[in-house]
Regions:
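Sec-dependent N-terminal signal peptides
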Residues: 4-16
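Boundary regions of SH3-family modules and the immediately adjacent low-complexity/disordered segments
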Residues: 21-33, 37-50, 54-109, 115-117, ...
Length: 147
């Protein structure tokens, strides 16, 4: 009985340590190949052409990360093409505010699908940059953060 319990505990530890913690990453370059499998020998599935694009990392195998984007496209990218996430995408048209409050002065209208660079986040708000604008947006209105 003792051996069975030890074996089960060992298997649980191995299985849980092999699964990747879900996190967000961003593209490091303007052109990044997404592959069918975690190898340079694997065929290219499609190509991203947007630096800083946020992606959800859902798995890892050696030097490759399995990702999924906002539109549920998935594939494998080599870690040399990824960086720690600092960007998000708006999930709907929203107002950018001067301060982290819905009662603050509105600065700009941000369109759905806009790529934003995150400066910092606090509670339910993130301070972001978007072209010529810098301001605050609610975290529920953006994709690319682990809440």
């Amino acid at each position: 009985m003792y051996k069975i319990v030890c074996t089960l505990i060992y298997l649980i530890i191995i299985i849980s340590s092999s699964t990747a913690e879900e996190t967000f990453v961003s593209l490091k370059k303007n052109k990044v190949n997404v592959r069918y499998g975690p190898s340079f020998d694997s065929d290219i599935k499609y190509v991203y052409k947007k630096i800083n694009l946020p992606l959800k990392q859902i798995d890892k195998k050696e030097n490759f990360r399995r990702i999924i984007d906002l539109k549920n496209n998935s594939g494998w990218i080599h870690i040399s093409q990824l960086k720690k996430n600092n960007s998000v995408i708006t999930t709907q048209n929203k107002i950018l505010f001067k301060k982290p409050s819905s009662f603050a002065k509105p600065i700009a209208q941000i369109e759905k699908g806009r790529l934003l660079i995150v400066d910092k986040c606090q509670e339910k708000w993130c301070k972001i940059e978007s072209g010529d604008y810098q301001g605050w947006i609610k975290t529920k209105d953006i994709w690319g953060l682990i809440n």
